[in-house]
Amino acid sequence: MITLDSIYNMDCLEGMKQIPDGSIDAVICDPPFGTTDNEWDDALPFDKLWEQYWRILKPNGVVVLFGQEPFASHCRLSTPYFRYDWIWRKTQGAGFLNAEKMPLRIHEVIMVFYQKLPTYNPQFTQGRPYKLTNDSFTKNYGKREKCVTISDGRRYPVDVLDFKGANNHPPKNGVGNTIHPTQKPVDLLRYLVLTYTNIGDTVLDNCMGSGTTAIACLKEKRHFIGFELNKEYFDKACKRIKAEQAQLTLF
C-alpha cells in the first residue's frame, strides 16, 4: 500500500497504479530524457504516463516536468494540456564534448501541464516602490482621466529562473557533493513546490532520483510520494530524506 511521505524502489508506472484516484495535488518530476546511454536514462512511454497522471491528480492538479530537447518537444506534443514553460537558467554550461559544433547548454525547460486552472502562488521578488501618474492626454487615445499607479515594490515572477545547479557547488572533502548526475538544486524545487501547492498538499515525484523533491516538500510542509527504480539512488535518497527529517525534528 502506498503511504504518504515515503519513496518506493519500484517501477513508477506500476507504483502509480496503487495511488487512489484524485489524491495528488501536483506532480513535480525530472523524468529521464532518453538522450544518453546510461541505464537510468530510458524515457517513459508518454501514453501510459499521462494515463496515470490524469487519473491520480485532483481536477485542478498540475504536472511540472523538467526537460531538454528533443525530449521536451515530444513531451509537449504528447498531450493537449501543455500550458507554458519556465526556463531554468544555470550558472555553468554543459555539453563541452560538442563545444566546437554548437553552443553550450546553460538552461533547461520546465514544462507545465494542467486541465483546470491549478494552484498558483506567485513567488514575488522585492523591488523599489514607485508611484506613476499618467498624463491626461496621450498620443494614441487622446484626452482621458489622469491615472495614478502605486506599487509597494513587489515584482511578479518572470518565466526565467536563475538558480545555481546542484553540481556547480564546490566539492566537499575532495569528492562531489551530489548523488545523481542530473540532481536539481533544492532551492529550485522549493520554488516550484511553493508556486504550485499549499501547505499540507501532496506532491508526487515518480522519478525521485536523489530525493530532492522530497527534501523540498519536507522543508515547505508538504507531503510527498516518490518512486525510484535504481536501487543505488533509492538507497542514497532514503538516507538523505531520513537525515532531513531528523534535522527538522530538532526545531
What feature does the model see in each segment?
Residues 1-226, 232-235:
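Core catalytic lobe of class I
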Residues 1-2, 238-251:
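Short, conserved SAM-binding/catalytic segment
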